[in-house]
Amino acid sequence: MGETTEGKVVAQNKKARHDYFIEETFEAGIVLTGTEIKSIRAGKMNLKDSFARIKNGEAFLYNAHISEYEQGNRYNHEPTRPRKLLLHKKQINTLIGQTQQKGYSIVPLKVYIKNGFAKVLIGLAKGKKNYDKRETLRRKDAKREVERAIKERMRG
């Protein structure tokens, strides 16, 4: 389903693609308070160790850290509160069916601003074993070596 992202990418979960095989991606909206969206627009968000879970037919994002807004007085938000994700019912049912299989989980890949709204790209992920991670690194290094050799050859 890979949607293209428009606008400013605010936060990326770089460890997600290292630790998981991403099977399918979904674009979801996030229910936020006023100070949260202001902090996100300022780029003060971290997706490290965050995950999504389906609870009572609704998707929630856990452990996503949005720093408190500097000018937000007593109405400021809690930095790591669970946040509701806005998905179509069909997408939620797909995620429920897939996550009930052993080894599948839902991880946020990136958060970006699209048409003034904060969106999160979540991925249906299957955990990698250590040997898979090493194999991925080997492949990446080999590709880098080939590109370096081609570049050197072109220079003459």
From Swiss-Prot:
Keyword annotations: Cytoplasm, RNA-binding
Annotated signal sequence range: none
Tree of life domain: Bacteria
CDD domains: SmpB (cd09294)
GO cellular component: cytosol
NCBIfam families: PRK05422.1, smpB
Name the UniProt record assigns to this protein: SsrA-binding protein
Gene: smpB
